[in-house]
Structure formats: C-alpha cells, structure tokens
Amino acid sequence: MNYLATTDYLTYGLDAATDPSWITAASAIIDAHCRRMTLGVNQYQERVKMPPELNTVRMSYLPLVTVAPATTPLVTLQARYGIPRRGEWPFPEMSLEFALVFSLPGMWTTIDPTTIDISPNSGELTFPVNALGLFFNEVDVVYNAGWNTIPVPVQVACAQIVKNAQATPGLNVKSSRIDRMRLEYFGGTLVDDTVRSLLAPYMAQKGA
C-alpha cells in the first residue's frame, strides 16, 4: 500500500505533481526496512517456543488489532506441551509415562482466544495455567496486526525517502516516473539516519 495519498504531497513537502510510482517504491522500501508485509492491518501466523516455566509469549508484529466483527486480535490459537527432559517432570506423584499415555505432551490443543490476556501494544500474550500446573512448550498463533491509519512518522519517512531519491545522482530524476525496482536498488542509501529514527518504533520485533 502507498503510505502517502496525492492529497498529502504538499503537506509533507513534495511537489503536487509527484507521480504515485515514487510513493509506491518508497513505501516498499519502508516495508522491507521494517521487515513487514505492510504497516497496514495484515494477518500473520507465528509458531513460537514458550520460555521455560513461563506462560507468556510476544508476537513479532505490532500493534495487535481487532478486525470487526471479531472481538480479539487472535484469529486461531493452538498450543502444546513439551516432553520434559530428564529431571524436569514437576509431579513425582504422577509418572511421566502416565501423562504420555493421555497425550499431555506433544499434542496440539486448540485454545479459545478469548481466554488469553492480550497486550496489543507490546504484543504479549499471557496463557492460563494448566489445571495440572503444566506449561505450554510451543504456540501457533494466527493474528491481525498493523495500523488502520498510517502513523504520521511513517508518512514523513515516506516523503523523505522520495526526497532522498530525487536528490540521488544515480537515479533518473528527469523522469516524472521512477521504476520501483530501480528505487529499491538504492534503498540502503535512501534510508538515512532521519528515516531510520522515524521508522524505529514500527520495526518487526525479534527475528521476524
């Protein structure tokens, strides 16, 4: 998606006659820099290892957002218990072999998303503790994240990338249009310190 509309050009210091292809290319550079498909609302799926003896995980793409008519940002949610290593089984009164017979570890369990405590801005999900006190080992989450309205700093960054491109000798600034792939080729130099600072809050978290 384009992060600037034609009606925004003058507001952000661009010529009103700027071709939308410049904005399209600059928006693609922003997506690549932020390691996201888009900063708009999008659906993601992540399979995440649960930290030992904790019942929380953090999603990579923020903020989590609810898409009507849903009542939660989570679309589907599954989790499973891991097979403990030697000496880690916490219930001496119940043998691990007994638990395995009833498929406690290793099996995926569907969880009602409405039972999860969600922090939309941090992306943290807190799971209820199992009746036996067991912790999940891994979770698979399908969720919605992004912005319905593109934040102003992202729009400023988009305009700045276009300005940087138009000031780059290697680009054909005589043409009103710019090839997207050509502009992306120069992406490393077009994303200057100012742009990096503006986009820092919108980067995907962890290794996404």
Where are these regions (language model features)?
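Divalent metal-cofactor coordination and adjacent catalytic microenvironments
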Residues: 1-208
